[in-house]
Amino acid sequence: MGKIDFRLEKTFGYTTGACAAAGAFSALYFLKNNEKLRFVEILNLKGDSLIIPIKNIEKQKNTAISTVEKFSGEDIDITNGMDIKIEVTLEKLDNNSSKSSSVKIIGGDGVGIVTKSGLQVNPGEYAINPKPREMIENNLKSLLENDECVTAKISVPNGDEIAKKTLNPKLGIIGGISILGTTGIVRPMSNDAYKESLAPQIDVALAYNFENLIFVPGNIGTKHAKILLNAKEDQIIEVSNFWDYMLDKAKEKGVKDITVFGHAGKIVKLAGGIFDTHSRVADARNEILCAYTSLITQDVEMLQKILQSNTTEDIVEILTEKGILTEVFEKVSKRVVERLSLRWEKINFSCIIIDMKGNILGKSD
């Protein structure tokens, strides 16, 4: 991508990892040059140049604290606008010191601590992923002399509250947010950071040796999978709208058996080959259900009602009145399995479709 100037850029954003790298760089620069930078130019791991504004910076003796405001561009998320503070302490090594020129990166208040196996970070450590850690380290090393070492402490004011609105509690990351971002760049409409937060669920499930994983769109599926399937928390994988991405990850990680489970409004789309189920991408629920209903009945008036329905629940009511609800949704659930099996052929799939109350509408076996 070359260079992105985030003082001007409004479409792209920068990750929590890029915030930490920029803040750490500005703090160390202040310590070494006694100059407060209003912005810094750092490099990501691909060699792209990122120009990131610095919100505030202050110094006490050999420590400087820099604040960077998270900016998500057009992909507004829960972390947009939050402050990330980086406290950098610089030490000069003498000839007798046992330390070597190095960068130490630690977490502080508002940065989560990992408690479960299977993630990129070991249990007991702060949730600072390897790629952003490497980006922070590389940019700090560019300022260090051979006889210097530095400690960078990352903290996020109110990070513990913000984290409650993320997947961190489910992943076993407690007390704060994660420092994420492979490239440091948040691309519009890509949801890269959000996808990156979803994928570790698979690692946790595999670390607990679950053979069958239950893929659900979100909270409704999670709630009823625990009740109907007696599923364990770490066995349930919340996919959101990103079925293609998450199933690619499952295949990549060697998952053999997946149960697709959730509300008809999302799962029906999979039968039509729609693997990003966000309504802005595609919404063919009515058309798909109309097509499968037409295999059972030629009642044109009813088919028209299905096409004109406002919600999937309305269609469920129409099919119930006609007495063909189960027959239609069993066909749909079987088609979901066929669609997924064609693309992710090494995974054994089953499918269960429910309504808002958790009633089973149809299943593939």
Curated annotation (Swiss-Prot):
Keywords: Cobalamin biosynthesis, Methyltransferase, S-adenosyl-L-methionine, Transferase. SUPFAM superfamilies: CbiD-like. It catalyses: Co-precorrin-5B + S-adenosyl-L-methionine = Co-precorrin-6A + S-adenosyl-L-homocysteine. The keyword Ubl conjugation does not apply. GO terms for molecular function: cobalt-precorrin-5B C1-methyltransferase activity. Pathway: Cofactor biosynthesis; adenosylcobalamin biosynthesis; cob(II)yrinate a,c-diamide from sirohydrochlorin (anaerobic route): step 6/10. The keyword Phosphoprotein does not apply. Signal peptide: none annotated. One of its GO terms (biological process) is anaerobic cobalamin biosynthetic process. It holds the Pfam family CbiD. Its EC number is 2.1.1.195. Belongs to the CbiD family. This is Cobalt-precorrin-5B C(1)-methyltransferase. It comes from Methanococcus maripaludis (strain DSM 14266 / JCM 13030 / NBRC 101832 / S2 / LL). The gene is cbiD.
